[in-house]
């Protein structure tokens, strides 16, 4: 009887969630053809088969058993094999290869002198792309790091966030050929692998902001998890900015309101009690903003997508207790990097809009994401619309690229990293042109 009641409640919540929050993005790029089977390796005979963290709560169905995280190629694609000609943008936007040969290219930062720094998550490196005599050269700036996903630049100092520590390299551009070992500034961080990688940015208050993800698909996190923190540039003065956040891989500041916006990846496998098609379509990932620093709670693990109580942890809670998302970005679309557009190259309609990289789903039979969308805002910072901007990374339900981060160049063009191909693309507006420069 208990299981019947739990199933009925979960199904009711799921249906209400689907009816209450339609998403124009959820139906994008509905590719033809089934997803390729991706099965986990069985545990050795005689050993308990403990599921990996990503499989926590996975329904015991044949369809769900075929879904697993998508592993990127182990090496970067050659420049002439990159999918530039298959990517689509609105009229008069142009795409070119800015740099290639950087396996697992993730976060992007551009210095005042034009050096582009590129992090990795699965490798141990941070790259630097240097323009010399009209040719771009890719250097391995530093190696031997652990999950160095987060990077930030401020006054000539490069900050690097690894799994459980943050370090810095002062005067980094004067030492590109022989950089020193990074100097540790902060290590009061958990060492959990699930959602342990960081995104790093410097706020208008000259403080470093970063995420500490929940160490699970769904669980009751410790007081040290599921939050945004900030520290002074020397690592002192740590404080919590917001709580109730499952996982962030992108943040940026509204150029006028100076409020922090961030993408959030919601839980997987909503319930083993649900039909697989409902479990795959709920919940939707989110775009959030912090309006009450130190007080905002975005609901994890009690509430998902702003209106859907968790079937395990949601009892006794109302989703209205928590800070609501300002946009929903599709189920399991994995929104990562995001950037407010403050340049002068693109048409006026994009001014102060947010470009968001949706890395793409893995736990959906028909995948969504693998694209760039643009959120256009009202003057009060709320979202007016979310529209496709760059598509083509997802072909016949298979990835030929996966966008991660977005950065704005001085001339108003934008850079987009692709960790599937180990490349960075540049998007310009104006007379059509194609370049395959490395």
Model-derived features with residue positions:
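Beta-propeller domain segments
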Residues: 43-90, 197, 214-218, 231-236, ...
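Surface loop/turn motifs at the tips and blade-to-blade linkers of beta-strand repeat domains
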Residues: 97-102, 139-144, 185-192, 240-244, ...
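Beta-rich catalytic cores
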Residues: 104, 122, 137, 144-147, ...
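Short loop/turn segments immediately following the C-termini of beta-strands
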Residues: 113, 120-121, 163-165, 171, ...
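Conserved beta-propeller blade signature
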Residues: 115-119, 157-160, 207-211, 259-263, ...
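A short loop-to-beta-strand structural motif that recurs across blades of beta-propeller domains
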Residues: 125-128, 165-167, 227-229, 286-288, ...
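Asp-box/WD-like beta-propeller blade repeats and closely related beta-sheet repeat scaffolds
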Residues: 138, 147, 152-154, 164-203, ...
């Amino acid at each position: 009887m208990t299981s019947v009641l739990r199933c009925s409640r979960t199904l009711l919540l799921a249906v209400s969630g689907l009816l209450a929050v339609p998403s124009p993005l959820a139906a994008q790029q509905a590719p033809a053809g089934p997803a390729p089977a991706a099965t986990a390796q069985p545990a050795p005979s005689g050993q308990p088969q403990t599921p990996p963290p990503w499989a926590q709560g996975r329904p015991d169905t044949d369809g769900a058993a075929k879904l697993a995280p998508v592993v990127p190629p182990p090496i970067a694609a050659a420049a002439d094999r990159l999918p530039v000609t298959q990517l689509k943008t609105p009229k008069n936007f142009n795409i070119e290869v800015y740099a290639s040969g950087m396996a697992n290219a993730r976060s992007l930062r551009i210095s005042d002198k034009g050096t582009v720094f590129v992090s990795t998550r699965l490798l141990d490196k941070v790259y630097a792309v240097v323009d010399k005599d009209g040719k771009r050269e890719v250097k391995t700036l530093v190696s031997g790091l652990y999950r160095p996903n987060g990077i930030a630049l401020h006054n000539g100092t490069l900050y690097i966030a690894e799994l459980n520590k943050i370090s810095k390299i002062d005067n980094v551009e004067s030492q590109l050929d022989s950089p020193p070992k990074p100097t540790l500034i902060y290590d009061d961080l958990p060492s959990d692998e699930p959602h342990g990688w960081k995104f790093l940015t410097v706020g208008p208050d000259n403080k470093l902001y970063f995420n500490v993800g929940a160490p699970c698909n769904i669980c009751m996190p410790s007081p040290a998890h599921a939050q945004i923190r900030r520290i002074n540039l020397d690592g002192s003065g740590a404080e919590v900015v917001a709580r109730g956040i499952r996982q962030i891989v992108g943040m940026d500041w509204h150029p006028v309101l100076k409020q922090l916006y961030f993408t959030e990846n919601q839980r997987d496998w909503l319930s083993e009690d649900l039909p697989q098609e409902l479990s795959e379509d709920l919940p939707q990932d989110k775009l959030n903003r912090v309006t009450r620093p130190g007080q905002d709670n975005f609901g994890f693990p009690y509430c998902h997508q702003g209106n859907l109580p968790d079937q395990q942890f949601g009892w006794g809670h109302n989703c209205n207790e928590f800070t609501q998302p300002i946009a929903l970005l599709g189920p399991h679309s994995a929104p990562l990097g995001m950037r407010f557009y403050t340049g002068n190259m693109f048409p006026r309609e994009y001014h102060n809009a947010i470009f968001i990289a949706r890395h793409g789903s893995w736990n959906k039979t028909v995948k969504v994401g693998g694209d760039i969308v643009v959120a256009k805002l009202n003057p009060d910072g709320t979202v007016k619309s979310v529209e496709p901007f760059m598509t083509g990374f997802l072909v016949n339900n298979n990835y030929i690229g996966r966008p991660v981060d977005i950065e704005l160049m001085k001339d108003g063009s934008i850079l987009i990293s692709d960790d599937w191909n180990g490349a960075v693309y540049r998007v310009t507006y104006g007379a059509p042109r194609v370049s395959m420069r490395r």
